[in-house]
Regions:
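Conserved P-loop
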Residues: 2, 9, 13-86
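Residue-level signal for inorganic ion chemistry
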Residues: 27, 63, 95, 136, ...
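Helix-adjacent hinge/juxtasegments
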Residues: 66-115
């Protein structure tokens, strides 16, 4: 899988996977260039999670500890396109973790999902730094029992398809292993 480690990163990379599949760790290593032991480069982390309970606060603290202090962190649960514009000023690779929590936040805020996704895709057009997105693949499991659960699963599937269409590289993580699903050559 030598081509997965090729740098520079393509303009847009999407890292998908289930819970605890290794997607965040892999995406962090892609963004910093440290996937195969290289010295990490600076990067910007856009966090979409909100610490609404103790378990989520613990997860956020674990992610921060793993990343260390070299990252510039922008916390934005809803306005992802605006956060990308803020991150552009740093001129460094950007990691967005994760689209799934962003979608959940949008649904709870009763935002227009199509409009928010359109805004995100438009923000990527001509963006000046590589962007790595993390998203959950929620459509491989059981059918959710509730209408809201099914609506979320369907919306997540549509968002993932839209972002995969936009992405130059798509990686599916399973059991900590990357499976390259799409790899458009990096434009020089």
């Amino acid at each position: 899988m030598e081509h997965i480690s090729t740098f520079p990163l393509p303009p847009v990379t999407l890292v998908l996977g289930g819970a605890r599949s290794g997607k965040s760790t892999h995406a962090e290593r892609l963004a910093t260039g440290s996937l195969f032991g290289a010295v990490p480069r600076p990067a910007v982390y856009i966090a979409t999670a909100e610490a609404g309970d103790v378990e989520m606060a613990t997860r956020i603290m674990a992610h921060r500890a793993r990343r260390g202090g070299a990252w510039t962190t922008i916390e934005e649960p809803l306005k992802l396109a605006e956060a990308l514009q803020t991150a552009a000023a740093h001129g460094q690779p950007v990691l967005v973790d994760c689209l799934t929590l962003w979608l959940s936040n949008l649904m709870h805020a009763e935002a227009d999902l199509d409009e928010a996704t359109d805004d995100l895709v438009m923000a990527l057009d001509g963006y000046g730094a590589p962007v790595v997105f993390v998203s959950n693949e929620v459509g491989l499991g059981l059918v959710p029992e509730t209408p809201l659960g099914r609506a979320f699963r369907d919306a997540q599937g549509r968002l993932n398809m839209r972002m995969a269409e936009q992405a130059d590289r798509v990686i599916l993580m399973a059991a900590g292993l990357p499976l390259l699903m799409k790899d458009r050559p990096v434009r020089a």
